[in-house]
Amino acid sequence: LCWRDSTHPQGGGSERYLERVGEYLASQGHEVVFRTSKHMNAAHREVRDGVRYSRGGAKFGVYPRAWAAMLAGRLGLGDLRGVDAVIDTQNGIPFFARLVSGAPTVLLTHHCHREQWPVAGPLLGRLGWFLESRVAPRVYRGAPYVTVSEASRQDLEALGIKGAHIIANGLDPVPDHVPSLEREAEVHLVTLSRLVPHKQIEHAMDTVAQTPGAVLDVIGSGWWEAVSYTHLTLPT
């Protein structure tokens, strides 16, 4: 379960991580269903690299639609019937699948979102952090947790979640033929991410601006893009 997949306009590394895990499991003979939101022009159902994608609901509707799909699955109906295990991805808040799936459930979270929730506004931000920091740990008490780094595990421990397993992010294989580029500067940096406030790309811009002769390539897009570009013109 994940709120987006990599074909979503706002999909990113979290979604790619889960897809790669799913593709590996599918290659080992397991049946993998990736339940996610239905974004514009996306099919309700498709199979990609051995993984079956099942979509329904938008930004907020994805959660109740997933609950309905899991409940239907317990009755032997729909895409989620016969499920042996569930991976519930917590992108701020989880699906709380443990309450409705009827199957062993693992909670996957890349990091805590304490610093990100204010972007959602004062009311929604407080509600989101309450669900993430207070409700989810109670619902998932005793369930396996997976995260991607020691820093994230320590953040989980601060919320009372002990013993989270670390499965680090991987890398896709390097292509056999990589073009060779001439060095443009003594210091050449690259950022690769969605352009949203909490990625703090402006920190890299400020650092490079203070380093004579340095070059920075900003790769990515997002709703914060115009603000990031405006930052380039501001005096440092």
PLM regions: where:
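Conserved small/polar residues in nucleotide/adenosyl-binding loops
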Residues: T230-T236
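Short N-terminal targeting/anchoring amphipathic segment
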Residues: R55, L71-F95, V100, V106
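Conserved donor-binding/catalytic core segment of Leloir-type glycosyltransferases
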Residues: V146, S180-K199, M205-D217
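N-terminal strand-loop element at the rim of the active site
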Residues: C2-S6, Y24-F60
